[in-house]
């Protein structure tokens, strides 16, 4: 029994140390169902969780957020290994999975809870998010309409929203097609839509160079 207790304690400590080496980022890009998949496909991402952020209601429900008045947006929280990927790479994927010109919603989903927002948690994330917005505006040739603000709290969404594209692949594909998401992304981003065909100069942001 004593040996078993020692093993449990050591194992738990090891997991905690590994988790402490991870970082997180929170993004709003319209329907959170559609924002999990592109980040899940990125090497170095450990997990994605759909949820709510930006509002004043504690532990909101989907019904409350959808009805309005909570101030929350649908978001995805991305936990990643900074040794395997970077916040800059997450930003690259984020921008190319949203319509950066629509501040009032995304695609067929309009309203406050669907507006695009980059929620930062550190000064470095704030600086990189601002730099990325300038970079995207330069690439696309006009200003972007995406809010960049500090994260006050993140609340996980209900279980049935998590991994929706995996659990309900047919409904997910139908919703995505009906909403015109891919069509609009192709119009805005061309062959870089959804984060494909990465721009090799994007990570110049890591050195502070935006050229």
Ranges and model annotations:
Residues 14-211:
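Flexible coil/turn and secondary-structure edge motifs
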């Amino acid at each position: 029994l004593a040996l078993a207790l020692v093993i449990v304690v050591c194992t738990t400590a090891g997991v905690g140390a590994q988790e402490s080496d991870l970082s997180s980022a929170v993004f709003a890009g319209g329907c959170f169902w559609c924002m999990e998949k592109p980040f899940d496909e990125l090497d170095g991402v450990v997990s994605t969780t759909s949820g709510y952020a930006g509002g004043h209601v504690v532990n909101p429900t989907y019904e409350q957020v959808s009805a309005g008045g909570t101030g929350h947006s649908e978001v995805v929280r991305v936990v990643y290994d900074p040794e395997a990927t970077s916040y800059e790479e997450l930003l690259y994927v984020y921008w190319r999975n949203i319509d950066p010109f629509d501040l009032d919603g995304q695609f067929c989903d309009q309203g406050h809870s669907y507006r695009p927002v980059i929620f930062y948690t550190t000064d470095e994330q704030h600086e990189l998010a601002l730099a990325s917005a300038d970079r995207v505006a330069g690439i696309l040739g006009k200003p972007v309409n995406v809010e960049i603000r500090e994260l006050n709290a993140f609340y996980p969404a209900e279980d049935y929203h998590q991994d929706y594209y995996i659990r309900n692949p047919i409904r997910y594909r139908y919703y995505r097609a009906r909403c015109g998401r891919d069509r609009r992304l192709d119009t805005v981003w061309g062959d870089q839509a959804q984060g494909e065909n990465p721009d090799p100069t994007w990570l110049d942001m890591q050195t502070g160079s935006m050229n």
